[in-house]
A protein has these predicted regions:
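Positively charged, low-complexity nucleic-acid-binding target-recognition regions
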Residues: 188-200
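Core catalytic lobe of class I
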Residues: 1-174, 179-181
């Protein structure tokens, strides 16, 4: 899949008030960064998601990969910074599992979020690159808008979409693998059922 092409399409459809969050690894983060710059997508922050419980390197030929890069970008450029950012929520955010984030202090660009998923997140199956729900929840805490729109172009098992539904957003996702489409559908149906039962 052509990274430049899908980023170009995201730039075309995202609103000035919106932003784009891209998960990357050491294999492709540099290339994604360059594509963003060539397209005029300004990088707001580069976040290092630190995974304390990352898998060990079994080959003994390199360091253990214990972080992933998340790029936060927008299309307005330096002169049109209209993207939404809930600064107060970023300061107030607190999680006992994050040993780096202090309550009522500015959120930093290193996030300490364990990579383990709950049983509820895995009960319908999993995806090889599935992220914990807590990662998406933190992102939406910073820039999600209730009743706003969330597009997930690589939906996988639906984690980001589940987070969006829990946040009260209108979600749309794309996925080409039928196995993961089925998992995502079950997770979304389960999430909607839980939300509906709260108001009965």
């Amino acid at each position: 899949l052509n990274t430049f092409a899908w980023l170009k399409e995201l730039k075309r459809i995202v609103k000035l008030e919106g932003s784009i969050w891209i998960h990357a690894t050491y294999h492709n983060s540099g290339f994604v960064n360059v594509c963003c710059q060539l397209l005029g997508l300004e990088i707001i922050n580069e976040i290092a998601w630190y995974k304390r419980n990352s898998f060990p390197n079994l080959s003994g030929r390199r360091l253990t990969a214990s972080h992933e890069t998340i790029l936060w970008v927008h299309k307005g450029g330096e002169k049109k910074r209209k993207y939404f950012f809930d600064y107060e929520a970023s300061k107030a955010f607190y999680s006992s599992s994050d040993l780096l984030k202090e309550k009522d202090k500015q959120m930093r660009t290193v996030w300490d979020i364990p990579n383990n998923k709950s049983k509820d997140e895995m009960k319908f199956g999993s995806h090889p690159t599935q992220k914990p729900l807590r990662v998406s929840e933190r992102i939406l805490t910073l820039c999600g808008v209730k009743d706003g729109k969330l597009l997930v172009p690589f939906a996988g098992s639906g984690t980001e979409m589940v987070a969006g539904l829990n946040f009260g957003m209108n979600v749309t996702g794309f996925e080409i693998d039928n196995e993961y489409i089925e998992i995502a559908q079950k997770r979304l149906e389960d999430t909607l059922q839980k939300k509906t039962s709260l108001f009965k």
